């Protein structure tokens, strides 16, 4: 197999350059006995974050964990990856500037769904994001709390902010801006926005109809649903597999991988909409 066209890592800013290139080489080496003998296609799989699973023609994304099989040599890997794993930060970064043909198709299918990972783990908690606003424009100080709650931090470039999870950038803020709306418009596929605000938050018609971005109405006993971690927001995430209902989605993203109630490893969550 010829050497693949290596590209720089497009999303994981907390991994060293040496490790990034090491990952590329490891992915390349995994394809030695791949059943599709087409160097250009295999190179595209490698560049798009995939390694061979050694089961049929199935490959797994190193960034979101999705496993995809039933490839064709003429598949546009960028399209397949972004379509079958729409919240993968790596896939979206690569595909965002692509112009895909309207009649593009694929026979590829998902064997196992992935789980996206964030770009800036150290900024997963709102308090860590709030701490980045020391040099934020004074005229926009009133926005900083809500911007941090919406998953963004100050990049120290003017009024530019970036999402800790998807790394999308938002700038040119106005005092009356809604940070959640600005974030969702910048990247409708941001996994963090979808998890916290609900699927379809960017759809203005649906937002007007169901108002998923509105805070849940208060009701008697709401204090009992207070997040056990931040003691501020309402709980809205059931942790799996332990099924403890103890945290809000904001704090879920900042967990150390264990349930704060029982310390069991957390594999996933169920989003709860409290009304």
From Swiss-Prot:
Keyword Transcription on this protein?
A: no
As for what it does, the entry says: Acts by blocking cellular apoptosis rather than by preventing viral stimulation of apoptosis.
In the UniProt record, does the keyword Zinc occur?
yes
Q: Which CDD domains match?
A: BIR, mRING-HC-C3HC5_CGRF1-like
Name the gene for this chain. IAP1
Q: Name one GO molecular function term.
A: zinc ion binding
Report keywords, A-Z. Apoptosis, Metal-binding, Repeat, Zinc, Zinc-finger
Pfam families from the xrefs?
Answer: BIR, zf-C3HC4_3
PROSITE patterns registered for this protein in UniProt: BIR_REPEAT_1 (PS01282), BIR_REPEAT_2 (PS50143), ZF_RING_2 (PS50089)
> How is this protein named in the record?
Apoptosis inhibitor 1
What stretches of residues are BIR repeats?
24-91, 126-193
The entry's Zn(2+)-binding residues are 163, 166, 183, 190
Renumbered zinc finger spans (RING-type):
227-263
Please spell out the taxonomic lineage of the organism that makes this protein.
Viruses, Viruses incertae sedis, Naldaviricetes, Lefavirales, Baculoviridae
The organism is: Orgyia pseudotsugata multicapsid polyhedrosis virus
